[in-house]
């Protein structure tokens, strides 16, 4: 799953990443709801999207907030929870979903 902002899809930045992943033979889904200083709801919606689509990897394309959103989605998926709020006080979570970050800032 590519985790990004709608604007980066519109500008063609994230679409280049999607195209490269598809060219490599991967099936790519896009979650483009990331925003600056995202509320926990954005992460939780990403978790639902990823879980419904059986996502096994995340590529976060964007700035710090987008990368943080991707990492938060990874955390909830890996730990088996339903919301990021469940993990505010977890010191060392176990990560089962693979994540790659591509900073654009």
Regions found by a protein language model. Name each.
Residues 41-105:
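Glycine/threonine-rich beta-strand-loop-alpha-helix active-site module
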Residues 1-57:
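ATP/NTP phosphate-donor binding region
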């Amino acid at each position: 799953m590519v985790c990004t902002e709608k604007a980066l899809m519109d500008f063609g930045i994230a679409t280049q990443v999607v195209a490269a992943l598809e060219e490599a033979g991967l099936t790519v889904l896009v979650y483009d709801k990331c925003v600056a200083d995202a509320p926990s709801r954005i992460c939780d919606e990403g978790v639902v999207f990823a879980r419904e689509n059986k996502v096994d990897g995340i590529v976060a394309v964007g700035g710090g907030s987008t990368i943080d959103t991707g990492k938060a989605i990874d955390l909830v998926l890996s730990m088996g929870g339903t919301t990021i709020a469940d993990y505010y006080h977890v010191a060392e979570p176990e990560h089962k979903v693979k994540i790659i970050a591509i900073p654009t800032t």
